[in-house]
């Protein structure tokens, strides 16, 4: 069992949160699994829909635009030629196959678990009490949010905030306070967490309830 310190809005340690050892279970080549997962996410976000028509696919008559001789113009075969407006495209993009990358559910969950464990082991994850997200601010105030990060010794560099979905109607003051900080890269909910968000964030601030829900989901699926 791993114990993580829990902080309040003033940066004071007010308790500890238990994290199951199974969260840190070895998955063999974990770095390769994380790499495959990130590649799949980035590849599948692309549309892969860029497609152009060549001269044989555009809708044009095959009739010569003018006679071969006597006009003074260069000879032309048809208006589908690339040099004409509306003609075919030469060497344009054309998807030759489905380039989406598939990754199964078990691999996806394992990658997220490894990324979360990695943040904990490198001290890049800060657990805060649920009141920080719900009751700490009575009104949006950026200075208060910035002071909170400094009091908790959170490095102001690519910070991801993770909260529980139950607080969606109660954490508006904190969300609005963080919105003006360039170091804050996102505010997400544990149930919708994406491994790419975890990988791209340098520091993570998570509520106790969100962490417990996330760990429980990842660990239970590992046992299955």
From Swiss-Prot:
Task: Provide one Gene Ontology biological process annotation.
Answer: translation
Q: Which Gene3D superfamilies match?
A: 3.40.1370.10
- Write the record's keywords in alphabetical order, separated by commas: Ribonucleoprotein, Ribosomal protein, RNA-binding, rRNA-binding
Q: Which InterPro entries match?
A: Ribosomal_uL4, Ribosomal_uL4-like, Ribosomal_uL4_dom_sf
Q: Name one GO cellular component term.
A: ribosome
Task: Give one Pfam family.
Answer: Ribosomal_L4
- Annotated Gene Ontology MF terms? rRNA binding; structural constituent of ribosome
Domain of life of the source: Bacteria
Q: Keyword Coiled coil on this protein?
A: no
- Describe its partners and assembly state: Part of the 50S ribosomal subunit.
Q: Which family does it belong to?
A: Belongs to the universal ribosomal protein uL4 family.
- What is the role of this chain? One of the primary rRNA binding proteins, this protein initially binds near the 5'-end of the 23S rRNA. It is important during the early stages of 50S assembly. It makes multiple contacts with different domains of the 23S rRNA in the assembled 50S subunit and ribosome. Forms part of the polypeptide exit tunnel.
Protein name as catalogued: Large ribosomal subunit protein uL4
Its source organism is: Chlamydia pneumoniae (Chlamydophila pneumoniae)
Supply the source organism's classification: Bacteria, Pseudomonadati, Chlamydiota, Chlamydiia, Chlamydiales
- Annotated gene: rplD
């Amino acid at each position: 069992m791993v114990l993580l310190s829990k902080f309040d809005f003033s940066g004071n340690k007010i308790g500890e949160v238990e994290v199951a050892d199974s969260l840190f279970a070895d998955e063999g080549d974990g770095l390769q699994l994380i790499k495959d997962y990130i590649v799949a996410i980035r590849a599948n976000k692309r549309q892969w829909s860029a497609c152009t028509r060549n001269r044989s696919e555009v809708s044009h008559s095959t009739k010569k635009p003018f006679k071969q001789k006597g006009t003074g113009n260069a000879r032309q075969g048809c208006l589908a030629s690339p040099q004409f407006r509306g003609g075919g495209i030469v060497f344009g993009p054309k998807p030759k196959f489905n380039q989406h990358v598939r990754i199964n559910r078990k691999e996806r969950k394992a990658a997220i678990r490894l990324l979360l464990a990695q943040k904990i082991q490198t001290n890049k994850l800060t657990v805060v009490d649920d009141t920080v997200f719900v009751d700490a601010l009575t009104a949006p105030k950026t200075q208060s949010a910035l002071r909170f990060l400094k009091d908790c010794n959170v490095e102001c560099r690519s910070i991801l905030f993770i909260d529980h979905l139950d607080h969606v109607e109660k954490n508006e003051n904190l969300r609005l306070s963080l919105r003006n900080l360039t170091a804050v890269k996102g505010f997400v909910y544990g149930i919708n967490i994406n491994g790419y968000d975890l990988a791209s964030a340098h520091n993570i601030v998570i509520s106790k309830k969100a962490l417990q829900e996330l760990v429980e989901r990842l660990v239970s699926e590992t046992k299955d």
